[in-house]
UniProtKB/Swiss-Prot annotation:
Name of the protein in question: Ascorbate-specific PTS system EIIB component
Gene name of this polypeptide: ulaB
Induction comment from the UniProt entry of this chain: Induced by L-ascorbate. Repressed by UlaR.
Keywords, sorted A to Z: Cytoplasm, Kinase, Phosphoprotein, Phosphotransferase system, Transferase, Transport
EC number: 2.7.1.194
Xref: InterPro entries: PTS_EIIB-like_sf (IPR036095), PTS_EIIB_2 (IPR013011), PTS_EIIB_2/3 (IPR003501)
Catalytic residue list: C9 (phosphocysteine intermediate)
Protein function: The phosphoenolpyruvate-dependent sugar phosphotransferase system (sugar PTS), a major carbohydrate active transport system, catalyzes the phosphorylation of incoming sugar substrates concomitantly with their translocation across the cell membrane. The enzyme II UlaABC PTS system is involved in ascorbate transport.
Entry note about domains: The PTS EIIB type-2 domain is phosphorylated by phospho-EIIA on a cysteinyl residue. Then, it transfers the phosphoryl group to the sugar substrate concomitantly with the sugar uptake processed by the PTS EIIC type-2 domain.
Organism of origin: Shigella dysenteriae serotype 1 (strain Sd197)
């Protein structure tokens, strides 16, 4: 199985696109089987079926609701692996250990 990440920002064109690339690089270097997509906060509900983890800024993460085996990771600096990396790895190792190589 591959853990599916969805990067979310206000309009889906700026921060989430860059965050998508940063998360992809980080997870590749961390040997995690993954896919990463991005969208605007207003579109995340239509993208939920293809995501296991939603990653967004802390203020936006509070607006995102998920159920079942889906998780939201709120980060202060969406572009810094030093900020999002440990939080994302914690969720992956706890809930998706089969994707850690």
């Amino acid at each position: 199985m591959t853990v599916r990440i969805l990067a979310v920002c206000g309009n889906g064109q700026g921060s989430s696109m860059i965050m998508k690339m940063k998360v992809d690089q980080f997870l590749t270097q961390s040997n995690i089987d993954h896919t990463v997509n991005s969208c605007a906060v207003g579109e995340y509900k239509s993208e939920l079926s293809g995501a296991d983890i939603i990653i967004a800024s802390t203020h936006m993460a509070g607006e995102i609701t998920v159920t079942g085996n889906k998780y939201v990771v709120g980060v202060r600096n969406m572009l810094s692996p030093a900020d999002f990396g440990p939080k994302l790895l914690k969720v992956i190792k706890e809930h998706f250990p089969q994707d850690v190589k």
